[in-house]
């Protein structure tokens, strides 16, 4: 056998089904081959391959260097057992995973567990695994950063259609991983005295942490590539040709990880690294493109867009490698998927058989990867006036699946793709218009000026996956944590934080304190022994009062910093818009469930303006949301329960645009008592005429137009929005206070004390001044107050402040204008019963006194007849019963039943 035949045989054993055709004549005959202008100059060539297999024509398939004719037969047989699908190595302990990324449609083969180890010529005695195996060329392998003279020639090989040189890209990125330091970043360049960590090798440290923690994802800041001088070209190539550069970076990570092991590493550690599939996830591009600005020039390039997640599909199995078996002879063959297409074998490749149309797809032997489609929409703040928001489809794969939920504000980095659309699903004729989508390689959630999502609303597996794989903006550094802990020890931290919340709004201290505690929130609890599986820790607040009292401004400020917040108006919202609605998917034509405002706000705060303008049908769905924090949907055959674990901040205007202090709150706002009672705090914001207060308010507003900082605030009195959100996020994520025994006793005493406010000296008038909902609200507010002080135990002072806030709110909105006393009957009982005119009650009391003189009694029916006779207007029986009940509660009369008749007696006659 000749040397060329042995070399070809070796190549066939290494990569079955791929021929060796990388001769010099084939290279010189390439249409892209340019002869050098001088004999000593470098020639630029593009390697050509044969089309023996569907994948052999790919521009990224290069054949590894031939092992030569003098390979021992034992080495060949061992290589055969590793590479051929029909032979299994008895020493292998685990099945390797698919080495192809779902987000990168590249035919570059990633490293496998059975990679052949080669000796690094620069480091004798150190065994390093070989790099990518390419078919159809004698190009260098990825592990050979310094090619030997035997293989190197005077040509520069680039990937077809690009200016990407594989060896140059490997060397450049390897040098970046090994040499990039913090001092190259822009924030370190302007420092006269660089900090101690300026010489830190950022990515070497990250790779070491990945090996220790067993991670496979490296988040690459693209700006680091740009500011590192040797990799500026690689930065532009990554932007223009991400499909070719990212697989090279993936393999380089594994090679550097192997280099970091040092001399003679343990075999188990070496095998563990070989079995892992390392992936690079670039982010932080220089420019974030608007969705409506995407154009055909961005196709197959790396882009970055921001938006709001509207819908996430279930996990879709995406086939990566198809397994076919001949139904005649049983011969098996695997075919890799290229951009969603399967090159199904027409005939059996076995020469002995050669049966046509006999290859069957075996699903349980095929390889699948996780895939999910996300619908991303423009955020309302970037939509131009008079236009509807644009949306784009995102395809996420592998670890990024289920990393984003409906309602998340995310920034994604990915490759802009386009695919043809068939004119008819059963025909291959396609339209001239292409459908576009984004293959996501990185997801960055939230905003620096927004709070972090409540971790208690995340499932444990999703939260763990997000913590490991997703780059969170709201990660707080150690320096910020130290500053937060120092600030929390200040005695006036409560006042400073409340002033920092909407500092442009004058005073309203108690309202701001209530909103501040709403942002911190209570603790969500689940008791397996309790009647309810979950007790809410979210706080609901309603602001009602006169117009032009800054209610809407407060809502917008809270919406800007609230996590997963949705801002909506009562008049422009419907029941399905708040909960969920059924729509037909444009791709699958199936009915899908779209999330509404309350479901999108899961784990955040939903701000509803003009709450009183809502229709009754829309308000009725809020009863379940505000107490059970779920939304039950039964539409079009879809029956499900969605989570709506959200705090509600609402504002309402009174009837007639002016609050009447002579009427109770239910008569002023036109809200049902059942809905009003579900708010933890109800604040009345009234526009009272006061010359001194008006002058101070006017001076404050004028000063806001003259300077950005309020007149009464200094740098030490008001925190910035970034620090305020960092403080609240740290408290929400790390502090889970527990009620102490002293605090529990104080809660009981405060509740009993609030109930005693309804007692009268005559011990017969029973006004409701507190219910168990006030007790639960007190618990939530006290937990939020403890969170604000970064305490893990609720103390007595927290309970006292919570009780003070509740009493202050109740004093304003639950005071009976007729008696001037606090009575929750105005809210919890029927409206007609509580709104009986006081003069009618007095007239009935006088009539009873006159008719029961001398200890006489009177039937209720007779009393109603006499009362109607002297009344000038038609008197309903319900109004009469309401007056009778009011007199009985006040201790004026007593109604008894005797022989089936109701009898009225004066209370003075019964004592």
Curated annotation (Swiss-Prot):
It is found in: Nucleus. Residues 42-56 have a biased composition (Low complexity). The modification Phosphoserine is found at residues 37-38, 41, 92. The keyword DNA-binding applies. ATP binds at residues 545-552. Keywords: ATP-binding, DNA replication, DNA-binding, Helicase, Hydrolase, Nucleotide-binding, Nucleus, Phosphoprotein. A motif (Arginine finger) lies at residues 677-680. One of its GO terms (biological process) is nuclear DNA replication. Its main location: nucleus. Residues 63-84 have a biased composition (Polar residues). The keyword RNA-binding does not apply. It catalyses: ATP + H2O = ADP + phosphate + H(+). Residues 493-702 form the MCM domain. Belongs to the MCM family. Acts as a component of the mcm2-7 complex (mcm complex) which is the putative replicative helicase essential for 'once per cell cycle' DNA replication initiation and elongation in eukaryotic cells. The active ATPase sites in the mcm2-7 ring are formed through the interaction surfaces of two neighboring subunits such that a critical structure of a conserved arginine finger motif is provided in trans relative to the ATP-binding site of the Walker A box of the adjacent subunit. The six ATPase active sites, however, are likely to contribute differentially to the complex helicase activity. This is DNA replication licensing factor mcm4. It comes from Schizosaccharomyces pombe (strain 972 / ATCC 24843). The lineage of its organism: Eukaryota, Fungi, Dikarya, Ascomycota, Taphrinomycotina. The gene is mcm4.
């Amino acid at each position: 056998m000749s040397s060329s035949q042995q070399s070809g045989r070796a190549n066939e054993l290494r990569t079955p089904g791929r021929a060796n055709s990388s001769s010099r004549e084939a290279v010189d005959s390439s249409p892209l081959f340019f002869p050098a202008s001088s004999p000593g100059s470098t020639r630029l060539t593009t390697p050509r391959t044969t089309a023996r297999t569907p994948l052999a024509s790919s521009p990224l398939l290069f054949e590894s260097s031939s092992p030569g004719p003098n390979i021992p037969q034992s080495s060949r047989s061992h290589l055969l057992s590793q590479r051929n699908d029909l032979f299994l190595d008895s020493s292998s302990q685990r099945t390797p995973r698919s080495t192809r990324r779902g987000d990168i449609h590249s035919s570059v083969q990633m490293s496998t567990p059975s990679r052949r180890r080669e000796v690094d010529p620069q480091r004798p005695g150190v065994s390093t695994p070989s790099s990518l195996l390419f078919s159809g060329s004698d190009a260098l392998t990825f592990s050979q950063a310094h090619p030997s003279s035997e293989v190197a020639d005077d040509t520069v090989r680039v990937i077809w259609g690009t200016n990407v040189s594989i060896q140059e890209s490997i060397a450049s990125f390897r040098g970046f991983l090994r040499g990039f330091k913090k001092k190259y970043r822009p924030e370190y360049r302007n420092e006269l005295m660089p900090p101690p960590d300026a010489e830190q090798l950022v990515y070497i440290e990250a790779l070491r942490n990945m090996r220790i923690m067993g991670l496979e994802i490296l988040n690459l800041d693209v700006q680091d590539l740009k500011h590192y001088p040797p990799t500026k070209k690689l930065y532009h190539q990554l932007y223009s040709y991400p499909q070719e550069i990212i697989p090279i970076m993936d393999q380089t990570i594994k090679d550097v990880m192997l280099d970091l092991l040092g001399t003679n590493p343990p075999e188990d550690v070496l095998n563990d690294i070989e079995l892992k599939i390392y992936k690079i996830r670039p982010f932080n591009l220089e420019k974030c493109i608007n969705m409506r600005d995407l154009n055909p020039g961005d196709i197959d390039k790396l882009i970055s867009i921001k938006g709001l997640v509207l819908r996430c599909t279930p996990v879709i199995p995406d086939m990566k490698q198809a397994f076919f078996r001949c139904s005649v002879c049983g011969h098996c063959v695997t075919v890799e998927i290229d951009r969603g297409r399967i090159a199904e074998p027409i005939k059996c490749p076995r020469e002995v058989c050669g049966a046509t149309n006999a290859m069957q797809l075996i699903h349980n032997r095929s390889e699948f990867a996780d895939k999910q489609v996300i619908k991303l929409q423009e955020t309302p703040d970037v939509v131009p006036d008079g236009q509807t928001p644009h949306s784009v489809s995102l395809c996420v794969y592998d670890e990024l699946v289920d990393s984003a939920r409906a309602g998340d504000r995310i920034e994604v980095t990915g490759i802009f793709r386009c695919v043809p659309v068939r004119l008819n699903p059963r025909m291959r004729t396609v339209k001239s218009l292409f459908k576009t989508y984004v293959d996501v390689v990185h997801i960055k959630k939230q905003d620096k000026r927004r709070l972090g999502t409540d971790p208690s609303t995340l499932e444990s597996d999703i939260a763990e996956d997000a913590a490991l794989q997703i780059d969170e903006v709201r990660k707080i550094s150690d320096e910020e944590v130290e500053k937060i802990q120092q600030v929390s020890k200040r005695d006036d931290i409560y006042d400073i934080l409340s002033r920092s919340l909407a500092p442009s709004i004058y005073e309203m201290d108690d309202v701001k304190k209530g909103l501040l505690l709403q942002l911190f929130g209570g603790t969500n609890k689940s008791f397996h022994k309790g009647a309810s599986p979950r007790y809410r820790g979210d706080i609901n607040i309603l602001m009602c009062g006169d117009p032009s009292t800054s209610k809407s401004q407060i809502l917008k400020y809270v919406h800007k910093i609230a996590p997963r917040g949705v801002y909506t108006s009562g008049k422009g919202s419907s029941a399905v818009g708040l909960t969920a609605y059924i729509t037909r998917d444009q791709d699958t034509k199936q009915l899908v469930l779209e999330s509404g405002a309350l479901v999108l706000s899961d784990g955040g705060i939903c701000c509803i303006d003009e709450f009183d303008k809502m229709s009754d049908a829309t308000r009725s769905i809020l009863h379940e949301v505000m107490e059970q924090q779920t939304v039950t949907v039964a539409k079009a055959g879809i029956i499900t329960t969605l989570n709506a674990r959200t705090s509600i901040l609402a504002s309402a205007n009174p009837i007639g645009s002016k609050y009447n202090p002579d009427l109770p709150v239910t008569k002023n706002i036109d809200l049902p008592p059942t809905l009003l009672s579900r708010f933890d705090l109800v604040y009345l914001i009234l526009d009272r005429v006061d010359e001194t207060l008006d002058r101070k308010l006017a001076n404050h507003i004028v000063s806001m137009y003259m300077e950005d900082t309020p007149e009464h605030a200094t740098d030490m009195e008001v925190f910035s929005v970034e620090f305020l959100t960092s403080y609240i996020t740290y408290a929400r994520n790390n502090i889970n206070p527990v009620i102490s025994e002293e605090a529990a006793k104080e809660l009981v005493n405060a509740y009993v004390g609030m109930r005693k406010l309804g007692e009268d000296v005559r011990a017969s008038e029973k006004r409701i001044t507190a219910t168990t909902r006030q007790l639960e609200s007190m618990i939530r507010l006290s937990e939020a107050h403890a969170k604000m002080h970064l305490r893990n135990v609720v103390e007595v002072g927290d309970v006292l402040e919570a009780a003070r806030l509740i009493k202050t709110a109740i004093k304003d909105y639950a005071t009976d204008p007729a008696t001037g006393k606090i009575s929750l009957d105005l809210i919890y009982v029927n409206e007609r019963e509580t709104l009986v005119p006081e003069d009618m009650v007095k007239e009935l009391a006088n009539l009873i006194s006159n008719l029961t003189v001398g200890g006489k009694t009177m039937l209720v029916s007779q009393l109603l007849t006499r009362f109607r006779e002297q009344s000038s207007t038609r008197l309903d029986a319900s109004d009469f019963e309401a007056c009778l009940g009011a007199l009985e509660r006040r201790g004026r009369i007593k109604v008894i039943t005797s022989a089936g008749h109701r009898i009225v007696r004066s209370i003075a006659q019964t004592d």
